Each structure stands twice: as C-alpha cells, then as structure tokens.
C-alpha cells in the first residue's frame, strides 16, 4: 500500500439521502479492520460555516474540540468512528472562496487571473488532503446532489485528485435513490441512471453504487442498474429502523471488502466488538421510557440530532429504549404535553421566540419533580425560571431577550459585548473545549466521577455572577465553574429537593458515543427510569427490582 487512499461519496436524485451515514458506516467498517481513517464533509453552500444558519433549514450545528461550527454529519462521523475530529473535517464553499480572495488581495497569485480552475479547485484539493500523518484512508463526502451548480467545483477537484493519485488509489461511491411509485406499483431505475450520467459527464465513473430504497430492490433491477451505469459493485441499502445497523448492512453486501480490494488496502479481519453491545442493547431492551425534548426547533428533528443520539446512548448500558416526545416551546398545552413523561431535556437555541414557553415548561418539570437536563440555553432558562418563581425576581430575564430587564440573571459575556456592537456574529462565540471544576459531593461530580472535566461550548451569554449569591441562598446550587474566567458552568438542585435537576452551559451531546454514553444523559435516563418504576409500583403495575 503506497500513500493515502481516497474515497469520495457523492449523492444523486435527492438530498438528505444518507451520504453522511454511508460515509460514517464505511469509515467504521474500515476502522474495525485496523485501518486509520480520516473523514470529512464538503458543503457547497457559500456560508463560511453553519453557525449563523437557521436550524430549521440546516439542522444542528456540531461543535468540535477545537471550536469549529460544523455540519451535523461531522457528529455522525465522530459517533460511528469513535474519534474527535477537528475543523479540517468540514469544508465549505465560503471558506474556500474567502481563502482564495484573501490570497488574491495579498498578491500571492502574482498577477494571475484568478479562476475556478485552477485556483478554487486547488484550494479544495488542499483542504481535502489535510489529515494527520498516519492516516491510511481519507473519506470525503461531497454534499448536495450531483448536477447542482454549487457542487461542480468540488466534483472537479475530486476528479483531479483521482488523476493525480491514480485510479487505483481513489474510489468513488455514488449514493442514489431508487423510488417506488405507488401508482405504478414498481421501483424506478431511471433517476439513478440519469444521476450517474451527470456524474460521468463531469468526468467521474463511479466504482460502486449504494442504492437507497424503502423496499428491497429486485435482483433484476439491480442488474439493470449495474448494466446501464457500467458499475459492477451495487449495494442495496434498504431503510432500517436503527442507524447503527447500517455498518452491518453495508458489510453484508460486501462494500467494505470491495473498497479494500479496489484500493489494495492491507486490512485485517473485521472486529465487531464496537457494535455488538450497541446492537444487543437496541434489539433486546428490557424497558422503555419517554423523555420530552422541549425546544424551539422541534419541527426538524435534525436540529437536535446529537441530543437524540445522546439520549438513546444513555439507555444502552441499562438496555433501556428511550422514546422521544417532541414538545414545542410555543405549545399552548404544555401542562398536558408534560403530563406522563418520565424525563425532560431542554437543549440549546437562540432568540426570544418560544422563551416564555421554555420557562413555563421548566417550572412544570421542577415543581412536578420530573428528571430534567438543561443544555446551554436550557440551563439559562432554568436560572431565569428559578429567579422568577423561587427567588422573587419578577421579570428576571437574559440580556439576549430584554436589554432593560431589572434582573439580568443571564448576561452577555464581557468579551462578547464589543463583538455584538460590531455585528460580528459568525464564528465569534465562546467555542470549543473548556475546563470546568465541579463541586465535591455535587450531582454533577457524582455523574462524571471526577471534579475536573472538559466540555465543548457554543455561547455568548452566561449566568450573571452578580446574582449568584441570591440564587444560592434560595437553594440553587452552582456546582461547576470555569476557574480561568470565573464562569458558571453547572447548576443543580439538591437531591433532597428534586431527584434529578441539572443544567450545563456546555453541549455535552457532542461528546456522547454509542459505546461511551455521556454521564449527564446516562444519569437523566437512569433518573427517568426510576421515576417510571416508582410510578408503576405505586399504581400496583409492577414490583421494584
């Protein structure tokens, strides 16, 4: 094996077809065979990063250890490969053009006419090749759909890389939809044929096809697609109820073996130990609970995809299936919506819309002693609710929502004030991994099993230290601080007053893994399960174990 091998994942017919999960699953399979894999996503949009994009359009923003605001697929990569990626794992058209224009303005092109080819494509190729020195394979997912005008420079850059490294060192996998028409009663292969034709017109002949469908594709149709697209390796990836089955599906169809042979990789036998326990927990769960995600963007579950997966992982060890109940913070019937839930999670967000609903929901959870985890904005709203209804600071709020509030219990971070004045919103928050010191004997410390931790952050507002003492005097516990900046990172209630009530300024969902569930989510699931078992015991439905 000579040099780094490249695998490119493209998509056809429709977007959101599963390219990211295909890339993550293939990366997991190669990793389980002992290969060192680096994986990245190319996003064709002109935004520099997704940090300022509407979550209802784009989905969640996933934060890396080094503080990059990235596409949600990077979260899938980290969870499936059990790795921590950095900012080089997500490349956007905005980043590429910004860099090229900066180079042009500083005279680095020595008077050349700056063009898409070669200058833009050269910068894309440079970013594709960025990876640790000991990597065997770079998997690159090209976002969007072939034929999109925005994707063309990325497709061309990938074609050039194949030419430069040699066909034997490069593998193109095209993920395409094979739709089933109910009216005709049959699956249609033409969309995939046309998609591959567009790819071939761009100079790329795919080496393998991953055909997405809700129903199995007949052998005849698979052979037809193979013939018409001139591709021998055809995999039918039928929709599965659990995304962690996808590596098994691809392996059963031999995709990883094909890639290894095509690229002449020195790979060992596959080690399924990473997934065996996870799949066993999913398929053989012993109990079920319902946890409400109370948020501003519940219309698009992808806006909270890492929270969803962290909650699911939180139940794997105890073989507890976590069912999600979506509760919109603008819902007028919050009391009824939260009536029979076993636990609640209030994730992050921005802006004033839905805030009063969040505060109302948090009060319900606190007073009903529902196990509750607040994340980022969720923690801030927990503080606001407590200040209003326990401490008596009527009208308490955050300066994010109300500039002239009498009780700004949540306020703009000092270093963020000038940034906001200058309207510099992109990439300027407190981003990345920061240290927190937890109070000995606190719920937080007991969950983490240590008092010295690091978590990923994405915020520009903080709990106001000026009101901390009044909150503490009335029972709110400040259980974790960043000692370098004296920032409040964790709050909670005493376990004598509430079975599980904790908030963090961080985004712990970004560090959860299927085999290593995050302690906060694991704790929430355990508390929710205990609440359910106690309720069933009291109603005579079951006997406590």
Curated annotation (Swiss-Prot):
Q: Which InterPro entries match?
A: Class_I_gatase-like, CTP_synthase, CTP_synthase_N, GATASE, GATase1_CTP_Synthase, P-loop_NTPase
Residues that span the membrane, as ranges: none
Q: Which residues form a coiled coil?
A: none
Q: Which residues bind UTP?
A: 15, 188-193, 224
Q: Which residues does the annotated region (Amidoligase domain) include? A: 1-265
Q: Which SUPFAM superfamilies is this protein grouped with?
A: Class I glutamine amidotransferase-like, P-loop containing nucleoside triphosphate hydrolases
Active site annotated at which positions?
376, 507, 509
Tell me which PROSITE patterns the record gives: GATASE_TYPE_1 (PS51273)
An example Gene Ontology CC term for this record:
cytosol
Name the residues that bind L-glutamine. Answer: 349, 377-380, 400, 460
Write out the GO biological process terms: 'de novo' CTP biosynthetic process; pyrimidine nucleobase biosynthetic process
Q: Name one GO molecular function term.
A: CTP synthase activity
Domain Glutamine amidotransferase type-1: residue ranges: 290-534
Q: Which UniProt keywords apply?
A: ATP-binding, Glutamine amidotransferase, Ligase, Magnesium, Metal-binding, Nucleotide-binding, Pyrimidine biosynthesis
Give the miscellaneous note: CTPSs have evolved a hybrid strategy for distinguishing between UTP and CTP. The overlapping regions of the product feedback inhibitory and substrate sites recognize a common feature in both compounds, the triphosphate moiety. To differentiate isosteric substrate and product pyrimidine rings, an additional pocket far from the expected kinase/ligase catalytic site, specifically recognizes the cytosine and ribose portions of the product inhibitor.
Complex and partners: Homotetramer.
Q: What family name appears in the similarity comment?
A: Belongs to the CTP synthase family.
Which HAMAP family is this protein grouped with? PyrG (MF_01227)
List the protein's name: CTP synthase
Ranked from the top, the taxonomy reads: Bacteria, Bacillati, Actinomycetota, Actinomycetes, Micrococcales
């Amino acid at each position: 094996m000579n040099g780094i091998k490249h695998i490119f994942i493209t998509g056809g017919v429709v977007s959101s077809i599963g390219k990211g999960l295909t890339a993550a699953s293939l990366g997991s399979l190669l990793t389980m065979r002992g290969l060192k894999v680096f994986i990245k996503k190319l996003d064709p949009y002109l935004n520099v990063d997704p940090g300022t994009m509407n979550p209802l359009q784009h989905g969640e923003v996933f934060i890396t250890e080094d503080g990059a605001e990235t596409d949600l697929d990077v979260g899938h990569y980290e969870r499936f490969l059990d790795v921590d990626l950095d900012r080089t794992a997500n490349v956007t058209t905005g980043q590429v053009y910004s860099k090229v224009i900066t180079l042009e303005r500083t005279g680095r092109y020595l008077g050349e006419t700056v063009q898409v080819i070669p200058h833009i494509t050269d910068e894309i190729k440079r970013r594709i090749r960025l990876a640790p020195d000991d990597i065997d394979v770079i998997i690159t997912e090209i976002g969007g759909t072939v034929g999109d005008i925005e994707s063309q420079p990325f497709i061309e850059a990938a074609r050039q890389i194949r030419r430069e490294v040699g066909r034997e060192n490069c593998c193109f996998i095209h993920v395409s939809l094979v739709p089933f028409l109910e009216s005709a009663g049959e699956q249609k292969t033409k969309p995939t044929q046309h998609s591959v034709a567009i790819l071939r017109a761009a100079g790329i002949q795919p080496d393998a096809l991953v055909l997405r469908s809700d129903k199995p594709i007949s052998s005849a149709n698979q052979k037809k697609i193979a013939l018409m697209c001139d591709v021998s390796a055809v995999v039918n990836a039928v929709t599965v109820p659990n995304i962690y089955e996808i590596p098994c599906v691809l392996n059963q169809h031999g995709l990883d073996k094909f890639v290894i042979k095509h690229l002449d990789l020195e790979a060992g036998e596959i080690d399924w130990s990473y997934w065996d326990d996870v799949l066993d927990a999913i398929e053989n769960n012993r109990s079920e609970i319902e946890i409400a995600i109370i948020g501003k963007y519940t219309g698009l579950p992808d806006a909270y995809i890492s929270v969803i997966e962290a909650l699911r992982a939180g139940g794997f060890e105890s073989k507890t299936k976590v069912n999600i109940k979506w509760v919109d913070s603008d819902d007028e019937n919050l009391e009824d919506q939260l009536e029979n839930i076993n636990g609640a999670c209030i994730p992050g967000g921005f802006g004033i819309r839905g805030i009063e609903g969040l505060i109302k929901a948090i009060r319900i959870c606190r007073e009903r002693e529902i196990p509750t985890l607040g994340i980022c904005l969720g923690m801030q709203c927990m503080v606001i609710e407590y200040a209003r209804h326990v401490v008596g600071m009527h009208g308490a709020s955050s300066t994010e929502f109300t500039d002239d509030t009498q009780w700004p219990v949540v306020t703009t971070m000092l270093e963020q004030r000038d940034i906001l004045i200058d309207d510099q919103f992109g990439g300027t928050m407190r981003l990345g991994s920061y240290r927190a010191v937890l109070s000995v004997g606190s719920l937080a410390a007991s969950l983490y099993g240590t008092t010295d931790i690091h978590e990923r952050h994405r915020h520009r507002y903080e709990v106001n230290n000026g009101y901390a003492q009044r909150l503490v005097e009335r029972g709110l516990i400040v259980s974790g601080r960043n000692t370098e900046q004296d920032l409040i990172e964790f709050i909670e209630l005493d376990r004598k007053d509430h079975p599980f009530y904790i908030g963090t300024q961080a985004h712990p969902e970004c560090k959860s893994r299927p085999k290593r569930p995050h302690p906060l989510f694991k704790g929430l699931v355990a508390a929710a399960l205990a609440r359910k078992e106690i309720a069933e015991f009291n109603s005579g439905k079951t006997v406590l174990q």
